[in-house]
Amino acid sequence: MRKAEIKFNDHTAGWLSQDENGFHFIYDKNYLFNDKSVAISLTLPLQENTYDSPILFPFFDGLIPEGWLLNIVEKNWKLDQRDRMGLLLLAAKIALVQ
């Protein structure tokens, strides 16, 4: 299993993971129950339940480089462009800024 801490405005907003069943995102309890917290994406509204998907959630997939930059990333890091979680983990320290 691979797992990433998702930050929003320097606070742990949740956890993104990948296992043999696909991708999972869950909001951190402290973040979820803070009155000032907002969803990290319109497609991932605040909720207690885990989001599950067979593919990387589009919001996170959109953070991965594309085009010529993806080619450079693949060449330098020797990653397969189909390894979306690997690309995401290496391409960015996930810190979302409002």
List each model region and its residues.
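Broad phosphate/nucleotide-binding scaffolds in NTP-utilizing and phosphate-metabolizing enzymes
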Residues: 1-98
